[in-house]
């Protein structure tokens, strides 16, 4: 979810560092699902969402989901996502989208904004909700990172410290990045901030 501090931290530090490594995406494929602990309800016209950190989080979830659907280059999409996560304390959604699209060299911002401002955003977010709710076991907090559809809290902690190191240590193919850390490299432990799914203080507008 776009405004969970733990999600922000993992994306803008460990994941961003990994994406800078030459050939990282030859070793791993990343998928992001901007939903988290949100709730959805069906309306006469489609779907309505309430988000753990309020209306702004829902708006940024829509923006990130529309970009995910329309930006074909995974590097550009990640750079857009990383930028949004750093700037989403403001409610100037369009301003953030413009700045981040420029930074990520995305040329179809008009399509993204058309999606974001229309009913496509809610329809796509519903698909993300279905993907999230289909997790087995169900997620209990976010970030909730799976590897090949399997969740392991210890693995998530490793990826929070260094996604690049985790992938390099577990990759068995022929395209290992030259930027993989040397064996035995020790990484500082990242904060383990999470946003609990059933937090009773959530959804206060």
Segments from the language model and where they lie:
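N-terminal start-of-chain detector that recognizes signal peptides
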Residues: 1-5, 115-118
């Amino acid at each position: 979810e776009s405004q969970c501090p733990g999600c922000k931290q993992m994306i803008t530090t460990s994941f961003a560092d990994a994406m800078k490594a030459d050939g990282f995406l030859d070793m791993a494929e990343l998928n992001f699902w901007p939903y988290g602990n949100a709730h959805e309800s069906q309306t006469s016209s489609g779907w309505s969402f309430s988000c753990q950190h309020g209306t702004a989080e829902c708006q940024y979830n829509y923006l990130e989901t529309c970009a995910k659907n329309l930006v074909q280059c995974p590097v550009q999409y990640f750079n857009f996502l990383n930028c949004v996560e750093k700037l989403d304390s403001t409610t100037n959604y369009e301003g953030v989208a413009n700045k981040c699209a420029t930074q990520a060299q995305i040329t179809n911002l008009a399509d993204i904004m058309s999606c974001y401002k229309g009913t496509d955003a809610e329809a796509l977010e519903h698909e993300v909700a279905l993907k999230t709710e289909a997790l087995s076991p169900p997620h209990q907090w976010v970030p909730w990172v799976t590897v090949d559809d399997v969740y392991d809290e210890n693995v998530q902690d490793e990826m929070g410290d260094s996604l690049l190191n985790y992938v390099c240590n577990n990759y068995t193919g022929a395209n290992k990045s030259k930027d993989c850390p040397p064996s035995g490299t020790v990484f500082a432990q990242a904060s383990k901030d999470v946003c609990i799914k059933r937090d009773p203080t959530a959804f206060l507008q």
